[in-house]
Amino acid sequence: EAQADSPSFLVAAFYAFTSLSPVALESLLTDLPELARREQVVGSVLLAPEGVNGTISGPDQGVTAMLECLRSRISLGDAHFERLQVKRSRCKSQAFRRFKARRKREIVSLGQPCADPRRNVGTYVDPCNWNELVDDPDTLVIDTRNSYEVAVGSFVGSLDPATDSFRDFPDWVEQHLRPL
């Protein structure tokens, strides 16, 4: 049972690159807002043919119901959404004003039709090995966040492509990394 001064709302952030059929996408766009209303959940869920990306907030049972809905209807190839690690935190008041489920062309806007994050992925780095990797002088770290976010803080020695949006990153790669 929650104490009176402890945060009472659960916040869940999640994403998955997986194929969503047009039927599954439309069904979720219809069903998620109704479920969110019923469960008093607010936030945003982006749905695209390449997957799902969202952050939601609400009572524990409401957030759990939303995640269960997604788990039951989204497959990650031979894995299931239930095996996806959802990042959870708590807050004292609702983190968002309303709930929106939206259709997008991409869940991460890159604007490159040949880029398919469901098929072309890098090497997974275990968190235990992260510091060793970024401290290696042969590792090139590029901070792909926008200029404002990089100004707040970045990894020591990382390259700042000075982009306004992640969508600008492919052009920067063509101009600066392809010649290497």
Task: Describe the role of every protein-language-model region.
Residues 1-180:
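Cytosolic catalytic domains that perform sulfur/thiol-centered chemistry
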